[in-house]
């Protein structure tokens, strides 16, 4: 989870600022790129391929996918439809009976979830999306390349050519010099935690002399994707690349305050806190955690068993420890909080029980409303963003948030100008959790390696995905700066960089408790107002 907070817009011309083929100096990388372009028979912007539509299905599920019964197999049926026009694209993923979509309008990369709630992709996520788009739309061969040595792929010698698209991440292309076939590509090749590796194991013709990669094996889980159909469509227009409208909707009530409960959990380091509230799910009351770090709404077994919902798709979720928990996608008729009702919302239903919770309310609860939480008065108010504007009081700050992952991320700073990009997570009852890469790399220097007297403390974290397989080291930092707010003598623990990337993490409830919160996701903001606590 490597997050950034500065949104990058991509003007259509800039996104297509590919180096012209003519005028390149003769070099091994240029020759290899030209050979691959000849192997493909076309490149992005080729007038003979004004648009391209691909149908993609998995031929092999990821390794480690839980076994399922025959009746569940339809819930895992996956089909991807990808439409390209130059670098503009729309990628529709049908999974069981649900659909999610992502795309690029020429200015904005976006992602829309199963409820058609849409987020703009910010810097890191947008850069990743652009680089993947450049390869998928066959634009990489139009960029200038540098030689990166050679490698053996599937018993064949390849030469590695690195291209670096403007506003994207570097891409290493593994090209067979004998025929120009690309056998592998890696996005962010120098990042040990967040790189994307794709093996290309086959090609097919979609028009005479024009090829597309047709067998792709992705990532560490070895999932295989097959292109079953590839055509040049007609009638493609700009509107094909814009996000869909939300499928769920609110009926807003009287703006009456809704009680919330702040729970206290005693611990060795300090007291952990969380915020809970009651909601009626299809008329049945449940107790929910207010969790900005959750990318949707999740209901646990205690409530799910009473609802008797029909599964739409098999799915799963992970948490702070990177574990995977099986779940199912289900549709709720109503999710009522106070006199406000969210209609037709798709949520995840887990078989995992939690003793004190019936569910977790995250992104889809917050996506289309203004949710104002007053920790002093112990209530929240849900407002219609079409009728209300957020009032930013004196000493309050309206932070722009990066919602690329459907979780609010924004930068925090440490001594020496070091910056991290954590998620601001009201469901995390701890202080600050950062990627262990920031400690191991020496970017962060602790005020003290001890948290309590002479105790060298390690903490084992638990989350929705269970307990961590090993404890996390913890230290105390002099200060952390969150915008104008200074957070002093901060206890910080360090988690798995394969979960948090190089500079990600979580800022938890111990920070949030000093503020009242206004989540204004329709305007991409989180307003924090000091409450004197």
Label the predicted regions.
Residues 60-62, 150, 318:
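A cross-family detector of function-defining hotspots
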Residues 11-23:
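Bacterial N-terminal signal peptides
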Residues 57-59, 93-96, 111-116, 163-166, ...:
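Beta-turn initiation residues at beta-strand->coil junctions
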Residues 48-55, 84-91, 154-162, 180-184, ...:
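Short, hydrophobic/aromatic-rich segments at coil-to-beta transitions
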Residues 78-82, 166, 174-178, 182, ...:
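Pepsin/retropepsin-fold aspartyl endopeptidases
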Residues 2-14:
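Bacterial N-terminal signal peptides that target proteins for export
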Residues 24-32, 103-171, 177-181, 189-192, ...:
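Flexible, processing/modification-adjacent segments and terminal tails
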Residues 28-117, 296:
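N-terminal mature ectodomain segment of secretory-pathway/periplasmic proteins
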